[in-house]
A protein has these predicted regions:
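Conserved N-lobe loop of protein kinases adjacent to the ATP-binding glycine-rich P-loop
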Residues: 27-35
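Conserved N-lobe ATP-binding subsite of Hanks-type protein kinase domains
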Residues: 22
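Activation segment of protein kinases
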Residues: 45-49, 102-180, 222-258, 262
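Flexible N-lobe loop architecture of eukaryotic-like protein kinase catalytic domains
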Residues: 16, 56, 65-68, 90, ...
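C-terminal lobe helix-coil module of Hanks-type protein kinase domains
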Residues: 27, 70-73, 86-102, 199-200, ...
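AlphaC helix of the eukaryotic protein kinase fold
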Residues: 41-63
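Conserved catalytic-core element of eukaryotic-like protein kinases
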Residues: 208
Length: 348
């Protein structure tokens, strides 16, 4: 049963539910400000010790202030519920924003500051307009765990030793042409560059996001990418156990680095690996690892090489392919060291 209120926030409606919490559309009782409130608990969904630690870690996140980072308003524990109140962003998640199907005339994303309105500013020569509908609002479920099922288009379990399964069905020439359109690649570079800026800022403060995936990046009506869902963020110097549920590695398997999948300590390079998974997926149309279940996926992340990107999409931008391949190195020491290096590589 949903709480009627959490802390100073009146619960209005459910945005989405996940394995460790629920996200609500809520209103601050005094200011009237709308927010997305992620609620963890009540016990026994999360241990009391972990809940208190979460509240302390979330409180630190209130200091985050960057144009490509969703604002964290406040956090706390209220009647057994740990909660995190964040800026309510309307728009498209990164995957939807870069969908080839959206390269057509349509309204621009909806601003969190203004209701939907007709038209919307467009710049046909640079970033094509994108459509917004109910799915855009549901994209706020980005703050939740995604199911670990094999994405459509991935191969069955059988594959060559040491190499993850290739797509079950090669993409059509039309699909590949759409993936490689200059306008789409322009906004891909722009969006990922902004994500790199956000990561550089977060990492510079000593944080690791730990759950970077396409649905945790929203693009608003200003074509501004916004990194969101800091429910799993931790200080790189602290132990992972602070926000790990019993018997479970927290995060979304498909985008985890090998070290995170093993429950080892992580640093900024783990987030950069996750960014590499995102880039591979956006270039190939499918993720690098397509395991049909968590166990198979775990094995692929730890031991398999992704199918060569140029074998999946021969027309992919070579410079972007090189960036993705370096980010996906199993050994963190062979990846980019800092998000600023990725921004420079994208600009080059």
């Amino acid at each position: 049963v949903a709480p009627r209120a959490v802390g100073p926030y009146e619960i209005l409606s459910v945005i989405g539910r996940g394995g460790i919490g629920t996200v609500y559309r809520a209103r601050h009782r005094e200011s009237g400000q709308l927010a997305a409130v992620k609620v963890l608990g009540p016990a026994p969904a999360i241990e009391a010790t972990a809940a208190r630690r979460l509240a302390r870690e979330f409180e630190v996140l209130r200091s985050l202030d960057h144009p490509n980072v969703v604002r964290v308003y406040e956090a706390g524990v209220s009647e057994g519920y740990s909660f995190l109140a964040m800026e309510l962003v309307r728009g498209l998640d990164l995957r939807a924003y870069l969908s080839p199907a959206l390269d057509r005339e349509a309204p621009s994303p909806t601003s969190p500051r203004e209701p939907s309105s007709a038209g919307g500013h467009t710049d046909p020569g640079t970033i094509p307009p994108v459509a917004v509908g109910p799915a855009a609002i549901r994209a706020l479920a980005a703050m939740l765990d995604e199911p670990e099922t094999a994405p459509e288009g991935c191969a069955p379990p059988e594959s060559s030793p040491g190499i993850a399964p290739a797509p079950a069905q090669p993409a059509s020439p039309e699909t590949l042409e759409a993936l490689n359109r200059p306008a789409r690649l322009f906004r891909l570079r722009a969006a990922l560059g902004q994500v790199a800026d956000a990561l550089a800022y977060v990492h510079g403060l000593g944080f690791v996001h730990r759950d970077l995936k396409p649905s945790n990046v929203m693009v608003d009506d200003d074509r501004r990418a916004r990194l969101m869902d800091f429910g799993l963020v931790k200080l790189a110097s602290e132990r992972d156990e602070s926000i790990t549920l019993q018997g479970r590695v927290v995060g979304t398997y498909r985008y985890m680095s090998p070290e995170q999948a093993q429950g080892l300590p992580v640093d900024a390079r783990s987030d950069l690996y996750s960014l590499g998974v995102i880039l591979y997926e956006l270039l190939a149309g499918v993720p690098p690892f397509c395991g049909p279940d968590a166990a198979r996926l775990w094995q692929e992340i730890l031991h398999a090489r992704p199918p060569p990107l140029l074998s999946v999409n021969p027309g992919a931008d070579p410079a972007l392919v090189r960036i993705a391949e370096r980010l996906l190195e199993k050994d963190p020491d062979r990846r980019f060291r800092r998000a600023e290096e990725i921004r420079a590589a994208l600009a080059g």
